[in-house]
Amino acid sequence: ADDDNNTGADHKRTLHWNAVGTEVLSPATLTRFGVEYNIVDGLQHSPYRNVYAGGSIVPERHPDHRERRDAFLKLSQYFENRSSLRFNYRLYQDDWGILSHEAGTRLSQYVAPGLFASYDYRYYTQTAAYFQSDAYTSVGGIDGYLTGDYRMAALASHLFGFSLDMDLGVMAADVPALRRLGVRIDFERYFNSNNYSANILETGLDFRF
């Protein structure tokens, strides 16, 4: 570590509570819901991250206490055409001033024997922590706190995804070499309000013994 961000030993302690319920609304409809509550005490910033403040480079400082709360709802609906639609929503709030909403959906569709396709969308938005700033005017920050963590800033993001699952043992049952193989292809397009975007491609090969 640099001389300006050396810190002594510290700790972090988290107390976690949650309650989750599942309800079958019909033979084709399932819902899941829950709440979570976390109390975090101790070191909650990075001792290796610095911030430009008041013309100087200083270590970031976060509050030592944080209370985090969230609630979620998930709904799954299955259809007779061998497809399913899933919806999820999560609300989050903490005493650092961050309030976030996350909503997403997934459509899964049977295409042909051994072939399944999925389409995904997720939207996320959050407010900034009360002590976050793009330009601190003094080394004291805001109420004594400073952050260089991008996760403390306001944000809105979108994610689109598409995936294919192929069971080659079903699709090419007459080819002995493929009977134990499966292939998965995932593509995601992500972009946010902080001028960051990414294209993510993942592939996987499954071999069944």
Named regions from a protein language model:
Residues A1-A9, L15-W17, T105, Q109-Q132:
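Long amphipathic alpha-helical scaffold regions
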Residues A1-Y52, S56-D64:
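Solenoidal tandem-repeat scaffolds enriched in leucines and small polar residues
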Residues A19-E23, L73-Q77, Y89, T105-Q109, ...:
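Residues on the lipid-exposed face of transmembrane beta-strands in outer-membrane beta-barrel proteins
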Residues V24-L30, E80, A112, G169:
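Residue-level recognition of beta-strand termini and adjacent short loop/turns
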Residues L30-T31, S84, F116, A173:
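Secondary-structure boundary/capping residues
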Residues E36-S76, Q93-E102, G114-N195, N199:
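Outer membrane beta-barrel transmembrane domains
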Residues G54-G55, L107-Y110, V139-I142, L205-F209:
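Short, surface-exposed linear patches
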Residues Y78-L85:
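Gram-negative outer-membrane beta-barrel transporters
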